Swiss-Prot record:
Signal peptide: none annotated. This is Transcription factor ast-1. Changing residue 263 to I: In ot417; defects in dopaminergic neuron fate. Reduced expression of tyrosine monooxygenase cat-2 in dopaminergic neurons. Keywords: Cell projection, DNA-binding, Nucleus, Transcription, Transcription regulation. The gene is ast-1. InterPro entries: Ets_dom, ETS_fam, WH-like_DNA-bd_sf, WH_DNA-bd_sf. Its main location: nucleus. Changing residue 240 to R: In rh300; interneuron axon guidance defects in the ventral nerve cord (VNC). Partial differentiation defects of the VNC pioneer neuron, AVG. Disruption phenotype: RNAi-mediated knockdown abolishes expression of tyrosine monooxygenase cat-2 in neurons in the male-specific genital sensilla (simple sense organs) known as rays. It comes from the Eukaryota. It comes from Caenorhabditis elegans. One of its GO terms (molecular function) is DNA-binding transcription factor activity, RNA polymerase II-specific. Residues 72-143 are annotated as: Disordered.
Amino acid sequence: MQVVSSATLPPTVASADLAIVGGRSSDEDVIKYSAIQTIKQEQQQQQQQQSNTALPSYNFPFFNGMQNDFPPNRMLYNDNTMQKSENDHFTGMNLSTSASSSGNSTSSKDQSRRQFYTESSNSSGNGAAATSGSNGSSSSTESKSDVFNISMNAFAATPGSKSEDHNIPSFNMLSSYYTGALKLSNSTSFANPDPYQILGPTSKNLAHSGSGQTQLWQFLLELLSDKRYSEVITWEGTQGEFKLVDPDEVARKWGERKSKPNMNYDKMSRALRYYYDKNIMAKVHGKRYAYKFDFQGIAQALQPPTASHPQDYFNSHAMGRIAPDFSSWTSANYRSLNIAGFNNGSTIFNPSVNYSAFGATGTSNNLSAARAFPLYR
């Protein structure tokens, strides 16, 4: 116990704090006051230490900068062994610390631990009384410090494991469950189909269909059927859409096929507009140099025409079928059409059939005689 003189007493000391006994000197009173102050300081520090250890069971942080409060439904504590376990619903990890893992930790593990202390400064006492109070509570503070030690082994995939090198790949594998595993599995199963494998045989057959000269739409299908020309013209998907990557080069190749060295894209694009009304292809709106084939329209265009109007029966094909029917006919002998008995004029327009105008007598135009109308004499 340290004895202080009366000269060093603070001016704010109340008279009730001094226990004055009759017949004693003032130095004994000062010693009694110092003993009372020391007891009060120890009681206050014990109350502060109890308040520090009486924090809620989920109210201390893992790292600097993290939130101090964790939801109670995620943190479970056992007050007897101070064992903490947390199930992370993202990675499925069991984050826990136990006495076995902390007991087997080496000096290297002690260096990697993060210690968190909850300290509060003593602002009520000063002087020698505060110094003695801090020295008296140092041993109790060290005994309570293990409560706030959070081992880095809590982030191991298996509780109580001794090998940290073994836990690192396990943690990386579990942490990438929702970020990398699904992405890698989905990237191979949903690959885009190759349009050249799907549309290649069809475009090749249509490019060489029909007889006669190759048309422009057939020439484009011929280029699209060969993947070597993908640098100048290529498919855009599997629905018949294609794009002229180098329209000038496509026009030059079309000019070589038609022996027209002055061919350019402007002339070729005008020829492509002719196929819009034929439902062979169409321009893709909003995209430059993009077109789309209509395979149903191409199939209808390749079908032979059928006679749907009366004038279609008198075309060259119809007349070719009718000509053999008239080949055996010669010049018409219309005299064979005369019926017997009608070549005599007396039997036609005589008075017996009431044609009086022709049978009247005494007329000036000599109509009394029977008029004969010979037929093809």
